[in-house]
From Swiss-Prot:
The J domain is necessary and sufficient to stimulate DnaK ATPase activity. Zinc center 1 plays an important role in the autonomous, DnaK-independent chaperone activity of DnaJ. Zinc center 2 is essential for interaction with DnaK and for DnaJ activity. Residues 5-69 form the J domain. Homodimer. Zn(2+) 2 binds at residues 163, 166, 189, 192. PROSITE patterns: DNAJ_1, DNAJ_2, ZF_CR. One of its GO terms (biological process) is protein refolding. Participates actively in the response to hyperosmotic and heat shock by preventing the aggregation of stress-denatured proteins and by disaggregating proteins, also in an autonomous, DnaK-independent fashion. Unfolded proteins bind initially to DnaJ; upon interaction with the DnaJ-bound protein, DnaK hydrolyzes its bound ATP, resulting in the formation of a stable complex. GrpE releases ADP from DnaK; ATP binding to DnaK triggers the release of the substrate protein, thus completing the reaction cycle. This is Chaperone protein DnaJ.
Amino acid sequence: MNNTEFYDRLGVSKDASQDEIKKAYRKMSKKYHPDINKEPGAEQKYKDVQEAYETLSDAQKRSAYDQYGAAGAQGGFGGGGFGGFDGGGFGGFEDIFSSFFGGGGGMRNPNAPRQGDDLQYRVNLTFEEAIFGVEKDVSYHREATCHTCAGSGAKPGTSPVTCGRCHGSGVINVDTQTPLGMMRRQVTCDVCHGSGKEIKEPCQTCHGTGHEKETHKVSVKIPAGVETGQQIRLQGQGEAGFNGGPYGDLFVVLNVLPSQKFERNGSTIYYNLNISFVQAALGDTVDIPTVHGDVEMAIPAGTQTGKVFRLKGKGAPKLRGAGQGDQHVTVNIVTPTKLNEKQKEALRAFAEASGQEISTPKKKGFFDKMKDALEDI
């Protein structure tokens, strides 16, 4: 067996995170569960998935598997000659390897309540919704407790029974001959598939899983002043738990759409204002749009391009403090590209009054243009 087979069984890459491995396991486990999939070979594939997950979900087992393959994950790597060694107070090499590779009292009780998986849902907000806050209804698919069997997986009127093979532990002991001698390891029970229970008569709605798909709707209150990437946690709105465990949580990830007028950094809002050179030279009073409505702003005479004015309290709310941010207005002086004769005369008079000499560029004739063209060749 190569060192990627377990990853291939779950359909994940070798550098997959534990969350990705867990999700892949749940998907493959449901796909090949013997109570659901009656196709030939499904049960063996289910066992293969269980074996792969048992190793890859444990950090120490996974590390050993990545280095030595399946033998490493089972404790069967290294030199020989120690088969009959008794380590006194350590309980022997079998117990030492058992503590590292899945044996003994470290096994999780399969019948213990477990919380369901968390979910993520991405919500788009307009620029203004992020500033002022909003309440949104979101709808998504999730695994819910089966309404027919109340999560037991058994047909109404019946109950799951303790597994006769593993006696409810969910695991069985398997002896394996290794270079270190006979090693005992614990593996998932091949009868109850780790649940510790047998369902003689599965529920017809959920086919024994205890869960069913549903479309769930919930209202999300989004506070004022949020930004892209922030999350809101809704407790108990994730997927159904196991063995009576609580639902997981829903994490709402916020994405603020850009504005055509404004930019934002934290509680500060930025706005670019275009003005004429006449307004810049003589000064003016203009209306400035803000998210709170238009406000008047005075432009002093002699204002230069790049000058920044601050409108106090016209920014976004501060999430972790009182009050509002500010709006910064950056001035950009626009030079006209077309002037009529009257405007040109006025500017020439201004230049003359300022002691400036303005040379009017000569228009090039036909021969000048030909000369320039030949020089470029």
